């Protein structure tokens, strides 16, 4: 009979393996902690992009581990649990792509594939430029500001513009809805009276429909910049 090799690690081998790779494990966990804790669109777009890549990798990694668990189950109960968890992971991953593609068709923004949220804010400036930004939910009020000639919304840098470039309506899109916000108040000028230096706009949620942003674009340069 052929010799069978036992590939199971005993306690001492496990400790030795951990000692050899503990520095790598520490560095890897520290990297994940920094990315997940400090990866915000309002702080650093580079770290936020790395965070998105890490989150995107979690689902395929989870599915791969689930397939391995199904291939090498510890027992019958473990096989059933592995199948259920793997199917759930696959359905969740497919559902994410379906919702993201639907949102992309509505607003034509790569923010649609943001795994942290299911909504994208869009401001169609009167000069034809479209500014998209990540938003976690659909709020009742949005307050974009212009500071030193730069437009910000939800704390995110969007574009250089003038107060006159802000439209009457802005939008927050979800996979199945387009939420329309109407400008209800506008404050311009700072303490020095410079109206181009600082401006605050208040938009209140006005209505909801199923339209796409393309249907409200009129002239100007490319809508999807």
Swiss-Prot record:
Virion surface face of the membrane: 1-20, 73-77
Source taxon at top rank: Viruses
Any one annotated GO CC term: membrane
Entry keyword set: Glycoprotein, Host Golgi apparatus, Host membrane, Membrane, Transmembrane, Transmembrane helix, Viral envelope protein, Viral matrix protein, Virion
InterPro entries for the chain: GAMMA_CORONA_M, M_CoV
Single GO MF annotation: structural constituent of virion
Intravirion side: 42-51, 99-225
Parts of the chain that traverse the membrane: 21-41, 52-72, 78-98
Topology of the protein relative to the lipid bilayer: Multi-pass membrane protein
Subcellular localization(s) per the UniProt record: Virion membrane; Host Golgi apparatus membrane
Presence of the UniProt keyword Transmembrane in the record: yes
CDD domains the UniProt entry points to: gammaCoV_M
Quaternary state and interactors: Homomultimer. Interacts with envelope E protein in the budding compartment of the host cell, which is located between endoplasmic reticulum and the Golgi complex. Forms a complex with HE and S proteins. Interacts with nucleocapsid N protein. This interaction probably participates in RNA packaging into the virus.
Job of this protein: Component of the viral envelope that plays a central role in virus morphogenesis and assembly via its interactions with other viral proteins.
HAMAP family: GAMMA_CORONA_M (MF_04203)
Family: Belongs to the gammacoronaviruses M protein family.
Protein name per Swiss-Prot or TrEMBL: Membrane protein
Organism (species): Avian infectious bronchitis virus (strain Beaudette)
Lineage of origin: Viruses, Riboviria, Orthornavirae, Pisuviricota, Pisoniviricetes
